From Swiss-Prot:
Known EC number: 4.2.1.25, 4.2.1.67, 4.2.1.6
Recorded GO MF terms: 2 iron, 2 sulfur cluster binding; D-fuconate dehydratase activity; galactonate dehydratase activity; L-arabinonate dehydratase activity; metal ion binding
Binding site for [2Fe-2S] cluster: C59, C127, C200
A Pfam family annotated for this UniProt entry: ILVD_EDD_N
Entry annotated with the keyword Ribosomal protein: no
Effect of C127S: Loss of activity. Does not bind iron-sulfur cluster
Keywords: 2Fe-2S, Arabinose catabolism, Carbohydrate metabolism, Iron, Iron-sulfur, Lyase, Magnesium, Metal-binding
Enzyme kind, highest EC tier: lyase
Entry's Gene Ontology BP terms: arabinose catabolic process
Obligatory cofactor(s): [2Fe-2S] cluster; Mg(2+)
Binding site for Mg(2+): E91, D128, E453
UniProt name for this protein: L-arabinonate dehydratase
């Protein structure tokens, strides 16, 4: 007789599958129609593989194949894998913006975990919002969970030069406007940008969030950088499947891994890799689900003295494929540890500390992962700006900015929203030059709605034709992690709720002082108060559907832009019987 699987405790899936009651036979019997033999319901852990595959999410188009490797690992370790499709918010498809649906996806994931017979979860993610949304949902349930990402695309090349996902889209688009590239050449370049399955091959938001998951300890060491089509990505998926079974046995939960120390490690990692500004709102939101007190002040404090040592676009010149060959994120974590910038005893999903995982790794290419003395910037952390224009903060990515613009005073050229910007920006009669500061309103969490990636406003053609490639830009929007420029983002409070950004007028003088973390509208306190008292909202107001729910309940960018009723951990208690 085959020995029954033994586990140190009764698992929650046995509330559905264990015993001989009518309801158990109902749950168990119907699942058997998929050909599962009776002994699979003997108490072994049921592992939910939460898969964000979708034909509409091309970055995640290969996740079905990876899910099979995860299943193989779960079977090998004595678990029972069941794949569950979950909400997949594609960054390049969803309108008005995938960010508006991050919280909806997190809610759907949370309920999918809590409401079904899972003992542990594998979070199979890739595209930008899929990683934070699944981490948020899993954190709110606090079942053993582990991340495996789909990995980046292979390098792109156009006429012998590297082409970075997104980064060169913005660059080539500006070249067309400046008359330096023909439309035909732009179309030719399109074929070089996405030449394999996977996420953006730059250090955009997808690769940043894969790195954040690894730095938080929520993915196996080395996961972040393996290319999507590399055979080692499949191996990583299979090893992840094996590991989650042991995590269930050990009852190793997200709340034990995603501690304040882990978040500080992730913030410093983001600085070292030149990561996306989007990591700010995502980590704030994830921390809010775990119950960790994380703020913009933590971002500024932890990232201020961390050099950017990863030489990847958009900050540097290489791509994720080279980063993987150089040793990937473990090398970066080791460098942080050697510099005293890592909480070495932070726990990871492996059951080992982060330092035990990375202390012996080797940097195979010091032009890709740079020595500190050759860093792209000596202070690479996301800058948190404050002042009368951003009382609750705004952010800027120094590694992607122009050094000569980090201290700048200029005349405001104001766009009331994205439509106003699009209507005016190509007009040669627009009163603007390279010394001006472009200001866009009503693009925040409530205003857009959803906080779209429109903050990196394209420059006016008449400025581009002068060879000018950057100007100071300020908004309450986000920007793509693949983008670059001296761009002030996430200005809080946003314009749509009557923040000071809402009352900036054409011709106002604005001062940006990055070294002193200052963003100042050069008008008197009395004039600012008068304008704010007279302000009236002029953004769209949805009256029904999810857009209405989102706009009513979304919080500000300074706290992570989560829905107010979703913050915190609600646990994984089994609900009442369904029949």
């Amino acid at each position: 007789m085959k020995k029954k699987a033994e586990w140190p405790r009764k698992l929650r899936s046995q509330e559905w599958y264990g015993g001989t009651s009518r309801d158990v036979i109902y749950h168990r019997g119907w699942l058997k129609n998929q050909g599962y033999p009776h002994d699979l319901f003997d108490g072994r852990p049921v592992i939910g593989i939460l898969n964000t595959w979708s034909d509409m999410t091309p970055c995640n188009g290969h996740l079905r194949e990876l899910a099979e490797k995860v299943k193989a690992g779960v079977w090998e370790a004595g678990g029972f894998p069941l794949e569950v499709p979950v909400f997949s918010a594609s960054e390049n498809t969803f309108r008005p913006t995938a960010m508006m649906y991050r919280n909806l996806a997190a809610l759907a994931v949370e309920e999918a975990i809590r409401g079904q017979p899972m003992d542990g979860c594998v979070l199979l993610v890739g595209c930008d919002k899929t990683t934070p949304s699944l981490l948020m949902g899993a954190a709110s349930c606090d079942l053993p969970s582990i991340v495996v990402t789909g990995g980046p695309m292979l390098n792109g090349y156009f006429r012998g030069e590297r082409v970075g996902s997104g980064t060169h889209l913005w660059k080539f688009s500006e070249m067309v406007k400046a008359g330096e590239m023909t439309q035909a050449e732009f179309l030719e370049a399109e074929a070089s940008m996405s030449r394999s399955s996977g996420t953006c091959n730059t250090m955009g938001t997808a690769s940043t969030m894969a790195s954040m998951a690894e730095a938080l300890g929520m993915a196996l060491s080395g996961n972040a950088a393996i290319p999507g089509v590399d055979s080692r990505r499949k191996v990583m998926a299979q090893l992840t499947g094996r590991r989650i079974v042991q995590m269930v046995k050990d009852d190793l939960k997200p709340s034990e891994i995603m501690t304040k120390q882990a978040f500080e490690n992730a913030i410093r990692t983001n600085a070292a890799i030149g990561g996306s500004t989007n990591a700010v709102i995502h980590l704030l939101a994830i921390a809010g689900r775990v119950g960790i007190d994380l703020s913009l002040d933590d971002w500024d404090r932890c990232g201020r003295d961390v050099p950017t040592i990863v030489n990847l676009m958009p900050s540097g010149k290489y791509l994720m494929e080279e980063f993987f060959y150089a040793g990937g994120l473990p090398v970066v974590l080791k460098r942080l540890g050697e510099a005293g910038l890592l909480h070495k005893d932070a726990l990871t999903v492996s059951g080992e500390t982060v330092w035990d995982e990375v202390k012996d790794v080797v940097n195979w290419n010091e032009d890709v992962i740079l020595p500190a003395e050759k860093a792209l910037t000596s202070s690479g952390g996301i800058v948190v700006l404050r002042g009368n224009l951003a009382p609750k903060g705004a952010v800027l990515k120094p590694s992607a900015a122009s050094p000569h613009l980090l201290v700048h005073k200029g005349r405001a050229v104001v766009f009331e929203d994205i439509d106003d910007y699009k209507a005016k920006i190509n007009d040669d009669n627009l009163d603007i030059d390279e010394n001006c500061i472009m200001v866009m309103k009503n693009c925040g969490p409530k205003g857009y709605p959803g906080m779209a990636e429109v903050g990196n406003m394209g420059l006016p053609p008449k400025v581009l034709k002068k060879g000018i490639l950057d100007m100071v830009r300020i908004s309450d929007a986000r920007m793509s992690g693949t983008a670059y420029g001296t761009v002030v983002l996430h200005t809080s409070p946003e314009a749509a709720v009557g923040g000071p950004l809402a009352v900036v007028k054409n011709g106002d003088m604005i001062e940006l002082d990055v070294p002193n973390r200052r963003l100042h509208l050069d008008i008197s306190d009395e004039e600012l108060a008068r304008r704010l008292a007279e302000w009236q909202p002029n953004h769209d107001l949805p009256t029904s559907g999810y857009a209405f729910l989102h706009q009513q309940h979304v919080e500000g960018a300074d706290t992570g832009a989560d829905l107010d009723f979703l913050k915190g951990c609600r646990g994984n208690a089994v609900g009442k019987d369904s029949h």
